Amino acid sequence: MATPETTTAIEVLGATQTAVALGWSAGTIEQTYRLYRDGAVVHEGTAIHYVDHGLAAATTYEYTLTCVTSSGESDGVSVSVTTNSAVVLITDRTAEDVYEGRAKGRYNALDFVRVGEAVAYLEERFSTVGISVPVSPKLDWQIDDIPTQAQALHYLEDIEALRGKLLEYRETVSAPDSLTSLTWGQANDIETILLDSEKLIRGIILSYRYYSGRVISGVHALP
């Protein structure tokens, strides 16, 4: 087996509140890639990308990538990345984002993770005002993952569950019926429902403060 090549670069493809996506170039020989986070191995395989999950918000991590063959392990290349401090929602995609291939115009694993983070966050937020929302978002998407029919249905059911609670109090946009041929406008609608849900919760909390005089601290804002 050949001596492992040294990778030339590792690229940050994106980050959310709890996940980081990384990519690198394939070598010219058969080898595996070993990825370390802060000195501990988190992934090893032949793929040239990886999404690391279960991270803390607003935290900086150092990733090091090496190449491995039976002859040994190469020197590593490193990159640092900081996770988002809050859930980020995108509601301003345009047709140009799609046609020009911009990041906002592509719906990928990190979008599924971001939305899942928001759904989990909103479930907790609704519970603070006594409202139960039955959701269970998937948060461990990888870059090559294509949602199965069941996963796509569950993804939209979580959005519809939040929308259902929202419609008891105010109007909002409709959720798409399917992820097949999802348009940029429908992608915006999904995250508008999440943003409107947060606005509703804030309004309930403010009303409760006004009528009861109780002070509720630590209201977290979705950007």
Report residues per predicted region:
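Short, flexible active-site loop motifs that bind/organize anionic cofactors or intermediates
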Residues: 10, 40-42, 51, 102, ...
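Pro/Thr/Ser/Gly-rich low-complexity, intrinsically disordered linker/stalk tracts
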Residues: 1-29, 57, 69-91
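Recognizes extended acidic, P/S/T-rich segments that occur
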Residues: 30-58, 70-77
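Extracellular "spike/adhesin" assembly and maturation modules
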Residues: 84-223
